[in-house]
């Protein structure tokens, strides 16, 4: 059975693994998921990620990040734009997550960017998710 929303599935897996204090989480890989993982690593929400090439398909393995007392780096994730309801934002009306403490992941014509990067470049796009 095919997945309707693979991005929501990825974010749910990462959130559930973080809430259960798992060290790693694996999922089927795609270019979009790898770019989202790059943004999460760049912003400090995950420790690392690897793409493993198998015979059947590629697997994305994300290593979760915790503080010294096992505090989660990833407090919450929310999927904004879905296949049934796309949400777009202009460059002048980009969302801020928790007053700038979180990150909005935006799909633009220049690739996947955070809300800060998109506002610096002056581009808008589809708001994929909020991470805090």
Curated annotation (Swiss-Prot):
Pfam families (alphabetical): Ribosomal_S8
Keyword annotations from UniProtKB, A to Z: Ribonucleoprotein, Ribosomal protein, RNA-binding, rRNA-binding
Any one GO molecular function term: rRNA binding
GO terms under biological process: translation
GO cellular component terms given for this protein: ribonucleoprotein complex; ribosome
Superkingdom in the source lineage: Bacteria
Family: Belongs to the universal ribosomal protein uS8 family.
Quaternary structure note: Part of the 30S ribosomal subunit. Contacts proteins S5 and S12.
The protein's role, per its UniProt record: One of the primary rRNA binding proteins, it binds directly to 16S rRNA central domain where it helps coordinate assembly of the platform of the 30S subunit.
Name of the protein: Small ribosomal subunit protein uS8
Species: Corynebacterium kroppenstedtii (strain DSM 44385 / JCM 11950 / CIP 105744 / CCUG 35717)
Lineage: Bacteria, Bacillati, Actinomycetota, Actinomycetes, Mycobacteriales
Gene that specifies this protein: rpsH
